[in-house]
Amino acid sequence: MKSYDVIIVGGGPAGLAAAISAKKEGIDSILIIERDNQLGGILNQCIHNGFGLHTFKEELTGPEYADRFIQQAAELNIEYKLHTMVCDISHDKVVTVMNREDGMVMYQAKAVVLAMGCRERPRGALNIPGYRPAGIYSAGTAQRLVNIEGFMPGKKVVILGSGDIGLIMARRMTFEGAKVQCVAEVMPYSGGLKRNIVQCLDDYDIPLYLSHTVIDIEGRDRLTGVVIAEVGPDRKPIPGTEMHYDCDTLLLRSEERRVGKECRSRWSPYH
């Protein structure tokens, strides 16, 4: 069984930064395990600029920012495996992984770093009534479809949730020729940066409805429209405030859930 001082699960920005820092502290035997086909994680689909101002003192796109870390990891000869899924981590830090080239392999680690990022909450967690037609995506999924896969989810879009990715996707869909009808936010304030509200919504005359949510989804095979309504302090819809929008695409931007949040851990007073 091959051994490593540190095994890092996840090759996104956090995993790369952890590996680079560990290497600079004198730890030689490091392995990054990434299930995707490239390092960089979520940064690869964030093609807008605004990254790198604090770390590199210049404005970069997401892929450019990721590439800086990938180059540093390469210069430090940090080992990594792509297309590799972690199946199990035992109490004695034996990491079991699987990929097409090696099959199932076990590695012994002295320390394991979990840097697996976050996952968007699905529609089912948002309690939106209606059928399940095609055309409903998380904002992150739509971002990957447009920026990496080269597919347009639809032509008439409503976005629920005003986090930064939701705001950025409103602008991105507009760039690609879609009509973004509105952005609705259940909270009385936006979850995104003021800069993104101005640059992604105000500059393109996209309305932002605070204290509003989607209360109905229309369509059987394909989404045909949504109904949004104002909500009170209890987040319940206020009768008489309903607005109908024809659309073929609904993007959901909700609170992210950390991957591995339920991993059991035990505090050690010696570390």
At which residue positions do the language-model features occur?
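Residues forming the flavin
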Residues: 1-262
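Positively charged, low-complexity/disordered segments
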Residues: 260-271
